[in-house]
């Protein structure tokens, strides 16, 4: 009897670690004005995810100066030769292994109806490694529509498993981003992997314990597998 219980415990632990390893999310973002950085901060207050910021290799560039001359030049170079690595601006090296993640959420600004050039560089270099992974897209812009950015993403990550909806956060609704992100996560069924609508807790919030069906427990749980503050634990 003891050996059976021990074997069951080991199997549960292996399942737990396997689930955590295969269901990880990476949020990749580039931010020039700071809007995308704010979006990522709000997003990661609602989900458990690692974060990777894309940085240009050359610092201090003013992409909007002289009538957006530099930004336009970078995008035109990509348009002219989209399959040539030399067409893309250099970015800082990244130390993330995409094999560790099941889901990639890309947060990028829109530049003149296209994806920001620096994010295009990252996806040109690593988009092939996203094949078969869940891919989400959050786009920040002043007012323009996002179809060009979506097209750029699908060109650079052709074999990603895209969520059913993309999220567009513009100047007029940026302050309402928390509600928009929460609704988007629901629309794409992001939380179905755990069956829990929301488990991320702030440091000031009391601990919440759920069973595996997503039900909040109001009493001290008995022995078993539960989720506390977004993480599985065994009591």
What does each of the following model-derived ranges do?
Residues 1-6, 235:
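Positively charged n-region of N-terminal signal peptides that target proteins for export
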Residues 6-15:
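Sec-dependent N-terminal signal peptides
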Residues 21-106, 115, 182, 186:
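N-terminal beta1-alpha1-beta2 submodule of the flavodoxin-like/Rossmannoid cofactor-binding fold
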Residues 225-235:
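C-terminal tail/sorting-segment detector
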Residues 45, 98-99, 124-132, 156-159:
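Short, conserved loop/helix-junction motifs that constitute active-site signature segments
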Residues 131, 136-169:
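Short, glycine-/small-residue-rich phosphate/pyrophosphate-handling segment
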Residues 191-213:
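Residue-level detector of functionally pivotal "anchor" positions at catalytic/ligand-binding pockets or at interdomain
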């Amino acid at each position: 009897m003891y050996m059976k219980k021990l074997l069951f415990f080991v199997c549960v632990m292996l399942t737990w670690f396997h689930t955590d390893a295969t269901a990880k999310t990476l949020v990749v973002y580039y931010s020039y004005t700071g809007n995308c950085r704010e979006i990522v901060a709000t997003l990661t207050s609602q989900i458990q995810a690692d974060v990777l910021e894309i940085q240009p290799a050359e610092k201090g560039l003013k992409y909007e100066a002289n009538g957006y001359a530099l930004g336009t030049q970078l995008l035109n170079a990509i348009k002219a030769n989209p399959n040539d690595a030399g067409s893309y601006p250099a970015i800082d090296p990244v130390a993330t292994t995409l094999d560790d993640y099941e889901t990639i959420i890309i947060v990028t600004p829109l530049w003149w109806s296209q994806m920001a050039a620096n994010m295009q560089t990252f996806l040109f270099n690593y988009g092939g490694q996203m094949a078969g992974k869940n891919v989400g897209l959050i786009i920040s812009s002043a007012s323009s529509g996002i179809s060009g950015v979506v097209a750029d993403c699908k060109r650079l990550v052709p074999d990603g498993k895209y969520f059913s909806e993309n999220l567009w956060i513009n100047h007029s609704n940026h302050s309402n981003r928390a509600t928009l992100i929460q609704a988007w996560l629901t629309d794409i069924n992001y939380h179905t992997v755990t069956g829990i609508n929301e488990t991320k807790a702030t440091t000031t919030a009391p601990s919440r314990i759920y069973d595996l069906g997503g039900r909040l427990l109001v009493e001290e749980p008995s022995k078993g597998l539960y989720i506390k503050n977004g993480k599985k634990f065994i009591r």
